């Protein structure tokens, strides 16, 4: 018995030593090649998704003499979450996403986050509009299309909530035009597939916003990249993975990259580094060793959708219809029947169904999560896990789903759907932020966050939703934090040409909303509603499409222009 006790104690000691070695193992202990360039390049961008390419586009306009190098591990740009098939949701403008407008204990509706997201999306529209005018983006219908946004609920409590939500939001000029109905016939006119085959005794309600859009961020990323490549000061390196990041005494950076085809490594000397590598950003931030990286960990969650490509479905559903997450489910589980344009063709997606994976990227490694754990973040990760058991239970339940279970969820929103009509597709990975908050302690944070070092030489973007839809304003925030001197020295004036509302708030000015939306609607060929300057104006007039929009429209687009 004593021998067994000693053996058990020895095993425990070995496990503790192994755990300590694992948690304290240095991230950058190996030797790397010396930098091949004496004069540092101005900017290195890690990852060639919508975030990095948006930042590169800004910088090329603001500082065309800067040398910009982009390193991407895949063989093309926008291969991860920026790709249309991998993006969990597009055109996020808070018109329909109910998780952005929680009901407070006093029964009122919190609209602050929804208004902020709607404001941010207007900035995105201005940025894309400018790029169309400059010729960097081509025909608007290639990447953005009018697609009404709907919220759809059932049950007395949910119906009461949705009505209060609509009443709260339409007071803001950004949400003017949002309609509410409990009439099954009206809802069927908006979205036939939601209502056909539904129990006529079931009470339902919906909101309908004609100004919604669908956006293909893969197309935007590829077209902006092609525009960047026209400059001799821009270089894109595909099949190159960053393997080391080290700061020099002068605060510049040595970025070591591996050529995945040749198997060789090289090092680039850079003044500034942006880590825009999606889910991989956390590990690269940790690799940098900056003190700010110690406050973060990540929790990966994948997603799957049911995809409909048959014309009998896609021709009859031209809206994005968002529901309400089941009680106890996390915000990422909000179901939606979503009209998209992918590979130039209409598609309808239903989901998401969560997919647990330890990968930080769709094309990543199963070791990603474990290799991101260290002595700085293991405590917060365990505490967040303890406080979010509902999320753990939800993911376990999702892992047990079969096709029959998915079909059962689908018919709640598409009652006449047949199992043979859809195929299961896997979307991209998202890594939710686990953050050490100075006031709240460790928290699981939904959304995106910019992390910069105190010297303004490195920045990283962590997190997910609303993500790509607000990439232009997110990159504006990043530049304000990372390049404060340049912003004051002239960038801000130039930015007002790219984003006319820069430095001003749209959400408290109907006149400014009208001015900006007129501009972007004409360029992007999107519906437009005149917001009455009188706050007590009557019901909205019909949404109009500017005369500049001469493209052929399908029946749904014609209807929403009325």
UniProtKB/Swiss-Prot annotation:
Enzyme class, first EC level, given as a word: oxidoreductase
Pathway: Carbohydrate metabolism; tricarboxylic acid cycle; oxaloacetate from (S)-malate (quinone route): step 1/1
GO terms classed as biological process: tricarboxylic acid cycle
Keyword rRNA-binding: no
Family annotation (Gene3D superfamilies): D-Amino Acid Oxidase, subunit A, domain 2, FAD/NAD(P)-binding domain
Keywords: FAD, Flavoprotein, Oxidoreductase, Tricarboxylic acid cycle
SUPFAM superfamilies with a match to the protein in the record: FAD/NAD(P)-binding domain
Single Gene Ontology MF annotation: L-malate dehydrogenase (quinone) activity
PANTHER family, alphabetized: L-2-HYDROXYGLUTARATE DEHYDROGENASE, MITOCHONDRIAL
UniProt protein name: Probable malate:quinone oxidoreductase
Name of the coding gene: mqo
């Amino acid at each position: 018995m004593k021998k067994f006790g000693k053996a058990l104690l020895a095993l425990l000691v070995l496990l503790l030593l192994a755990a300590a070695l694992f948690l304290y193992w240095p991230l950058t202990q190996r030797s790397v090649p010396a930098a091949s360039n004496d004069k540092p390049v101005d900017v290195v961008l890690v990852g060639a998704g919508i975030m990095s390419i948006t930042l590169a586009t800004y910088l090329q306009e603001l500082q065309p003499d800067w040398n910009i190098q982009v390193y991407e591990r895949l063989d093309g740009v926008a291969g991860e979450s920026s790709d249309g098939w991998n993006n969990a949701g597009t055109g996020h403008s808070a018109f329909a996403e109910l998780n952005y407008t929680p009901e407070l204990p006093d029964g009122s509706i919190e609209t602050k986050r929804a208004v902020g997201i709607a404001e941010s999306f207007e900035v995105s529209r201005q940025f894309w509009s400018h790029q169309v005018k400059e010729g960097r983006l081509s025909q608007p219908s290639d990447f953005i299309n009018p697609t009404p946004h709907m919220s759809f609920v059932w049950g007395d409590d949910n119906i009461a909530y949705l009505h209060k939500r609509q009443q709260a939001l339409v007071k803001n000029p950004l949400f003017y035009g949002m309609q509410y109905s409990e009439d099954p016939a009206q809802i069927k006119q908006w979205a036939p597939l939601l209502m056909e085959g539904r129990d006529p005794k079931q009470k339902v309600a919906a909101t309908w916003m004609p100004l919604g859009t669908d956006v293909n961020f893969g197309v935007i990323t590829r077209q902006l990249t092609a525009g960047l490549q026209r400059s001799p000061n821009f270089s894109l390196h595909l099949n190159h993975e960053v393997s080391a990041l080290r700061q020099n005494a002068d605060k510049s950076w040595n970025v070591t990259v591996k050529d995945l085809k040749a198997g060789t490594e090289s090092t680039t000397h850079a003044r500034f580094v942006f880590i825009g590598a999606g889910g991989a950003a956390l590990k690269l931030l940790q690799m940098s060793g900056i003190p700010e990286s110690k406050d973060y960990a990540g929790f990966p969650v994948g997603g799957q959708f049911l995809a409909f490509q048959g014309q009998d479905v896609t021709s009859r559903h031209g809206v994005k219809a968002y529901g309400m997450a089941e009680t106890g489910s996390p915000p990422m589980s909000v179901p939606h029947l979503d009209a998209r344009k992918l590979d130039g063709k209409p598609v309808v997606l239903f989901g998401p169904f969560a997919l647990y994976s330890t990968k930080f990227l769709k094309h990543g490694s199963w070791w990603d999560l474990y290799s991101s754990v260290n002595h700085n973040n293991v405590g917060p990760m365990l505490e967040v896990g303890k406080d979010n058991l509902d999320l753990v239970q939800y993911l376990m339940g999702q892992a047990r789903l079969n096709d029959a279970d998915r079909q059962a969820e689908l018919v709640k929103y598409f009652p006449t759907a047949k199992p043979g009509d859809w195929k299961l597709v896997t979307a991209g990975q998202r890594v939710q932020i686990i953050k050490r908050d100075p006031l709240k302690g460790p928290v699981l944070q939904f959304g995106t966050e910019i992390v910069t070092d105190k010297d303004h030489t490195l920045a990283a973007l962590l997190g997910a939703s609303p993500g790509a839809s607000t990439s232009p304003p997110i990159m504006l925030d990043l530049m304000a934090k990372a390049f404060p001197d340049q912003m004051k020295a002239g960038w801000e004036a130039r930015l007002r040409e790219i984003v006319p509302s820069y430095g001003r708030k749209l959400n408290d000015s109907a006149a400014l909303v009208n001015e900006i939306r007129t501009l972007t609607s004409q360029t992007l060929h999107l519906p437009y509603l005149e917001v009455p300057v009188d706050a007590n104006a009557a019901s909205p007039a019909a949404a109009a499409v500017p005369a500049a929009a001469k493209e052929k429209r399908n029946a749904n687009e014609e209807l929403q222009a009325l």
